[in-house]
Amino acid sequence: MNPTSADFVIPPALETAKPFGETEMYRILCDMEKIVPTKHNLNRVKNMSPFWKGDERSYNWFLDFVKSEWGEWIERYARGSHSLSPVTRKNGSPFQMVQAELWSLIHKPTWISSGFISPTCAVCMTNPVWVDFVWSCKHISTCIKCLKMLSRGSNGFKCPICRCQQRVRNY
């Protein structure tokens, strides 16, 4: 029996492999921003590659958090219930807290130090994280095996995403 094109199913692209502006999370945050404006400009991060690139577990955890906090509220707003006012808390509206958390996650992987989510190497995706790039880019964290491969044959090494010269912090 010869395989046909119908026999092969192309898996959908992973959300974390897409530019941030094409993800479901970005769309949800844009909807939220229409309801409650914040100091963060989502267009500034639209084409970024967030720290979770390739890390579906971390991405899905945060997406579930955003949906659980705001899913029903966004749906009610979309249906025309514009009279809803955001519930305020000590640190601002829940949306502003979600936005602030997202902003920090895009720029600095604080979840590594908190131990909340068990991080894996962003290069091989299997080994636990051993180092975090601590130069200005903060794009990626790696295991010791991938660190050795990245730094082989050079004076130091560069971030594989932005080519910024790196130094490391061990965990």
Curated annotation (Swiss-Prot):
A zinc finger (RING-type) spans 121-163. GO terms for molecular function: zinc ion binding. This is Putative RING finger protein 027R. Transmembrane segments: none annotated. It comes from Invertebrate iridescent virus 3 (IIV-3). Pfam families: zf-C3HC4_3 (PF13920). Belongs to the IIV-6 157L family. Keywords: Metal-binding, Zinc, Zinc-finger.
